[in-house]
Amino acid sequence: MRKAHIFRQTKETAIDMEIDLDGSGVYQIETPVGFLNHMMESFSKHSFIDIKLKAEGDIDVSYHHLVEDVGIVLGQAISKALGDKSGINRYGFAILPMDEALVLCSLDFSGRGLFFYDRKDLRGKITEFDFELIWEFIKGFALESKATVHIKILDGHILHHIAECSIKSLAFSVRQAVAKQDKGILSTKGLL
């Protein structure tokens, strides 16, 4: 059973998440940040990972803590559910469009949590949501899932589309990488 439950509480946030890697993309997402809900629903749907999430935080200060911490907990949950990573594809990649936006994501559950992205110049708001929080979310996910993640924005000018396309391409890449195979651990070292 490739499932995990993580509860994380700090002075800034309280997050309770359950996942099933072998699900069908069923989700129950409850946070006080509408755009974060939308992104988590999209991640669940396109990764085929069932996600139950209840999260709250000091959004009166900023959305930053909550968004970053949800990414952290998602990464922790996936890492826990994968165990020693035996029998997974390890790698995943996608180039996905959303209207004018085109985003590439490449992912490796290598055991090394790293995140690289381009277009650091993109700034702005999606309703009350700061666009750059998408990068904080993915960075938290990458570090805690121990995955190397690359995101390249190939085209686009509407921030909502770029953000959503980034999350969907990440989800699609995760779906490929966690898919089962019967060749053991895909590493010449013998572990990930």
UniProtKB/Swiss-Prot annotation:
Its main location: cytoplasm. CDD domains: IGPD (cd07914). Keywords: Amino-acid biosynthesis, Cytoplasm, Histidine biosynthesis, Lyase. It is an enzyme of class 4 (lyase). InterPro entries: IGPD_sf, ImidazoleglycerolP_deHydtase, Ribosomal_Su5_D2-typ_SF. GO terms for molecular function: imidazoleglycerol-phosphate dehydratase activity. Signal peptide: none annotated. It is found in: Cytoplasm. Pfam families: IGPD (PF00475). GO terms for cellular component: cytoplasm. Pathway: Amino-acid biosynthesis; L-histidine biosynthesis; L-histidine from 5-phospho-alpha-D-ribose 1-diphosphate: step 6/9. GO terms for biological process: L-histidine biosynthetic process. Its EC number is 4.2.1.19. Belongs to the imidazoleglycerol-phosphate dehydratase family. This is Imidazoleglycerol-phosphate dehydratase. It comes from Hydrogenobaculum sp. (strain Y04AAS1). The gene is hisB.
